[in-house]
């Protein structure tokens, strides 16, 4: 892959929310370019719009003005070539680990049996192959987040969006997960946008770090 090819482009992005009494500006004139296969962290204080920016790039949140493009195509809705990992694993407790990983395939209307081997491969890669038939409640927080990463990768997306995925973990588990994520990225060379509060985490993981200012945020 050509790492100099621009994969994600954000231009003059603005996002506002309307309350009963006023219009709140969540993001103001954000500019960003991310190259293909690059690992980029988005760093900034609480409430500066990091998660808002990430969800907008994923097509999960409408924007007020500006443009977002992935592979030169404007983002207006969720894209099949994008995977998302949220702050909490949000696994379905009644489904097994393997069934949780395969859930996006069902949502996309694809044949689940065609992706069973890939689910097994991802679970093996993250050390969870022995837990494929377990329920989420039988796994630790760190293990559940690894399941969430497998789920985000099951349809082989080119772009992976991660919204503070390790913020709820203890320090040792978080360090282990950072090592695991870096290994996965080095093996698969996806483009990763990673939201975090931690300067240490951002520096450890990233090719580059984007820093957002306090509200009204800009970059």
Q: Which sequence ranges carry the predicted segments?
A:
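Short coil-to-helix segment of the ABC ATPase nucleotide-binding domain corresponding to the Q-loop/switch region
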Residues: 95-103
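The feature captures the beta-strand-to-loop junction immediately N-terminal to the Walker
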Residues: 43-45
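Helix-to-loop junction immediately C-terminal to a conserved catalytic motif
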Residues: 58
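Catalytic Walker B motif of ABC-type/P-loop ATPase nucleotide-binding domains
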Residues: 160-163
């Amino acid at each position: 892959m050509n790492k100099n090819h621009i994969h994600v482009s954000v231009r003059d992005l603005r996002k506002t929310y309307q309350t009963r009494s006023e219009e709140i500006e969540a993001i103001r004139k954000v500019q960003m370019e991310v190259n293909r296969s690059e690992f980029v962290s988005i760093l900034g204080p609480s409430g500066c719009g990091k998660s808002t920016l990430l969800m907008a790039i994923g097509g999960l949140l409408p924007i007020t003005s500006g443009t977002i493009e992935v592979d030169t195509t404007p983002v207006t809705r969720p894209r099949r070539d994008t995977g998302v990992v949220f702050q909490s694993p949000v696994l379905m407790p009644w489904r097994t680990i393997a069934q949780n990983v395969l859930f996006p395939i069902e949502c996309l209307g694809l044949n689940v049996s065609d992706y069973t081997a890939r689910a097994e491969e991802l679970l093996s890669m993250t050390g969870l192959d022995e837990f494929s038939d377990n329920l989420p409640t039988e796994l630790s927080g760190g293990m559940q987040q690894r399941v969430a990463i497998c789920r985000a990768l099951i349809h082989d997306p080119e772009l992976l969006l991660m919204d503070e995925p390790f913020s709820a973990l203890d320090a040792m588990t978080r360090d282990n997960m950072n090592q695991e994520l870096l290994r996965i990225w080095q093996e698969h060379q996806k483009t990763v946008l990673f939201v975090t509060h931690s300067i240490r985490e951002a520096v450890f993981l990233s090719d580059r770090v984007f820093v957002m200012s306090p509200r009204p945020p800009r970059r």
